[in-house]
Regions:
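Non-catalytic accessory segments flanking enzymatic or RNA/DNA-binding domains
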Residues: 1-132
Length: 132
């Protein structure tokens, strides 16, 4: 956690390393939760599903998978771009062969933290924009 500047003599506030909010600070409960669309990458055996959701916890829980590989910020436009990018690996629907190229892409997206840590950061940034 990083120190946040305070008045002289005060103990510095600490920022959460995941979401960036000051530890103990809670967003106003009356604020609407911001919509944060993500493209998700779920592995099941030797296939990877590339999909999108504005409610990733619910969506990921509803799909049988072995591993959540990554999230990236984006909506259906980004999802369609990824489907086109990896079309040569398509197995059917939104499922793609877990080829080294696709796995490397997911690994790059996941660098620096878990998918849920990335998502928490994006939600925190969206909340910060609504209160600024």
């Amino acid at each position: 956690a990083d120190a946040v500047p305070t008045a002289p003599g005060d103990q510095p506030a600490r920022e959460c390393a995941v979401c960036g909010w000051v530890v103990g600070d809670v967003p106003d409960a009356e604020l609407p939760r911001p919509r944060v669309d993500v493209v998700y990458y779920l592995r099941w055996h030797d296939r990877i599903k590339i999909g999108t959701s504005s409610q990733p916890r619910r969506r990921v829980a509803a799909i049988r998978h072995e591993e959540l590989l990554a999230f990236e910020p984006g909506d259906r436009v980004v999802e369609r771009a990824r489907h086109a990018q990896f079309a040569h690996l398509r197995e059917g629907g939104e499922w793609f062969r877990a080829d080294a190229e696709l796995v490397a892409h997911a690994n790059r997206l996941a660098a620096g933290g878990s998918p849920w840590e990335h998502y928490a950061r994006w939600v925190a940034e969206a909340l910060r924009r609504t209160v600024s």
